[in-house]
């Protein structure tokens, strides 16, 4: 894999969420991007079980268990303000056995699904973020395949993002700053998705139609 940037695209003025997704994919196709299947990234939140907190008024910690269709044999466990553990798919079974320590947060599952596009050395994924039956936002992931160090290709990634996102192109992801000259890996992408999902959860105190 290369270096990846994950961002949110706001719903276009006067358009529905689905219409905005269609506008984005049409722009990509006009650039010459070709469809290459579909993708899915999902996330379920777990919180520290009350029985493990003691009586000192300690705050519970969160853990995010995530899957990415690009890595079908892996499961990612991201701890709040902590490390990212990469395990095999049986980790979900282990979480059931750890219910005395971590409990699934009610109605916490969030996911994004959509279409993959290949454009030269760029892999682009435009997805609809959903919580339960409701569409909550739009995710855009762009990967530049030939490079594995973020600082070496961010300007190129940004230029490509601006070509179809315009003024909505994002700033550099926080994981880039933390790993300026380090080799980029799958965990860095999952951290970006975790941040995106948490941002969308906080935004969705109002109906998605109200976003402009």
Curated annotation (Swiss-Prot):
<dbReference type="InterPro" id="IPR013921">
    <property type="entry name" value="Mediator_Med20"/>
</dbReference>
<keyword id="KW-0805">Transcription regulation</keyword>
<dbReference type="GO" id="GO:0005634">
    <property type="term" value="C:nucleus"/>
</dbReference>
<dbReference type="Pfam" id="PF08612">
    <property type="entry name" value="Med20"/>
</dbReference>
<comment type="similarity">
    <text>Belongs to the Mediator complex subunit 20 family.</text>
</comment>
<dbReference type="GO" id="GO:0032968">
    <property type="term" value="P:positive regulation of transcription elongation by RNA polymerase II"/>
</dbReference>
<protein>
    <recommendedName>
        <fullName>Mediator of RNA polymerase II transcription subunit 20</fullName>
    </recommendedName>
</protein>
<dbReference type="GO" id="GO:0070847">
    <property type="term" value="C:core mediator complex"/>
</dbReference>
<dbReference type="GO" id="GO:0016592">
    <property type="term" value="C:mediator complex"/>
</dbReference>
<dbReference type="GO" id="GO:0003712">
    <property type="term" value="F:transcription coregulator activity"/>
</dbReference>
<dbReference type="GO" id="GO:0051123">
    <property type="term" value="P:RNA polymerase II preinitiation complex assembly"/>
</dbReference>
<keyword id="KW-0539">Nucleus</keyword>
<dbReference type="GO" id="GO:0005654">
    <property type="term" value="C:nucleoplasm"/>
</dbReference>
<comment type="function">
    <text>Component of the Mediator complex, a coactivator involved in the regulated transcription of nearly all RNA polymerase II-dependent genes. Mediator functions as a bridge to convey information from gene-specific regulatory proteins to the basal RNA polymerase II transcription machinery. Mediator is recruited to promoters by direct interactions with regulatory proteins and serves as a scaffold for the assembly of a functional preinitiation complex with RNA polymerase II and the general transcription factors.</text>
</comment>
<dbReference type="GO" id="GO:0035914">
    <property type="term" value="P:skeletal muscle cell differentiation"/>
</dbReference>
<keyword id="KW-0804">Transcription</keyword>
<keyword id="KW-0010">Activator</keyword>
<dbReference type="GO" id="GO:0060261">
    <property type="term" value="P:positive regulation of transcription initiation by RNA polymerase II"/>
</dbReference>
<comment type="subunit">
    <text>Component of the Mediator complex, which is composed of MED1, MED4, MED6, MED7, MED8, MED9, MED10, MED11, MED12, MED13, MED13L, MED14, MED15, MED16, MED17, MED18, MED19, MED20, MED21, MED22, MED23, MED24, MED25, MED26, MED27, MED29, MED30, MED31, CCNC, CDK8 and CDC2L6/CDK11. The MED12, MED13, CCNC and CDK8 subunits form a distinct module termed the CDK8 module. Mediator containing the CDK8 module is less active than Mediator lacking this module in supporting transcriptional activation.</text>
</comment>
């Amino acid at each position: 894999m290369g270096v990846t940037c994950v961002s949110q695209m706001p719903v276009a003025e006067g358009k529905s969420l689905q219409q905005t997704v269609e506008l984005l994919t049409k722009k990509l196709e006009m650039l010459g991007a070709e469809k290459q299947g579909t993708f899915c990234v999902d996330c379920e939140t777990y919180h520290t079980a009350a029985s493990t907190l003691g009586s000192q008024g300690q705050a519970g910690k969160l853990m995010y268990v995530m899957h990415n269709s690009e890595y079908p044999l892996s499961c990612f466990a991201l701890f709040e303000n902590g490390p990212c553990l990469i395990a095999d798919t049986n980790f979900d079974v282990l979480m059931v056995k750890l219910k005395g320590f971590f409990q699934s947060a009610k109605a916490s599952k969030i996911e994004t699904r959509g279409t993959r596009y290949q454009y030269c050395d760029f892999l682009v994924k435009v997805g609809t973020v959903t919580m339960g039956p409701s569409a909550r936002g739009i995710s855009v992931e762009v990967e530049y395949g030939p490079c594995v160090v973020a600082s070496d290709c961010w300007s190129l990634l940004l230029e490509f993002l601006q070509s179809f996102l315009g003024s909505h192109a994002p700033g550099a992801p926080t994981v880039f700053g933390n790993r300026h000259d380090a080799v980029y890996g799958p965990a860095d992408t999952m951290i970006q998705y975790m941040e995106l999902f948490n941002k969308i959860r906080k935004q969705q105190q109002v109906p998605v139609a109200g976003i402009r």
